[in-house]
Regions:
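Flexible, gly/pro- and Lys/Arg-enriched active-site loops
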Residues: 35-44, 54-60, 64-150
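N-terminal beta1-alpha1 ligand-phosphate binding loop
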Residues: 1-21, 27-31
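A structural preference for short, hydrophobic beta-strand core positions in alpha/beta folds
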Residues: 25-26, 149
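Short, mixed-charge, low-aromatic patches
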Residues: 15-24, 88-96
Length: 150
């Protein structure tokens, strides 16, 4: 997986270079316990806030291209170790559910490794489907995930 912090910094820079995308917020970095597959190293996680005119599907395609072209990601083990994983959590108030994209991200409200860094940059942001703020979702979360600010 290489230098996890450097990978996050490179990913932030790559996303910031996308046309019609401006990084307007970056959470602190967190070291988090793996979810879904046991026996693997911890992950580093962060959340970016973007201002973009790109439609959701096009933004997702560009994020996936960064994963493959810059970080040589090949998808083998679901939830397995990888150098970088760029997820699109929200796109304004968009609600999408198709073969390629689900917005809001279907498991974001269940994951401390998503909610904690999201809380750091937009605690009052409301989940478009649940109608609850990030702060409310985080306070209600019952999870044994370890999430440590680095």
């Amino acid at each position: 997986m290489g230098d996890r912090e450097l990978n996050l910094l490179r990913a932030v820079a790559e996303v910031g270079r996308l046309p019609d995308c401006k990084v307007t917020g970056l959470s602190p970095f967190y070291e988090t316990s793996p979810v879904g597959v046991a026996g693997q190293p911890s992950f580093y996680n962060a959340v970016l806030r973007l201002h973009t005119s790109l439609p959701p599907h096009e933004l997702l395609e560009r994020l996936l291209r960064i994963e493959t072209d810059v970080f040589s990601r090949t998808r083998t083990t679901h939830w397995g170790p990888r150098r970088i994983d760029l997820d699109l959590l929200l796109h304004g108030e968009a609600i999408i559910s198709d073969d390629r994209l689900k917005l809001p991200h279907p498991r974001m409200a269940e994951r401390r490794f998503v909610l904690q860094p999201l809380y750091d940059i937009v605690p009052d942001l409301r989940h478009p489907l649940l109608g609850r703020s990030v702060a409310e979702l985080l306070a209600a979360l019952r999870s044994d995930e370890t999430v440590t600010r680095i």
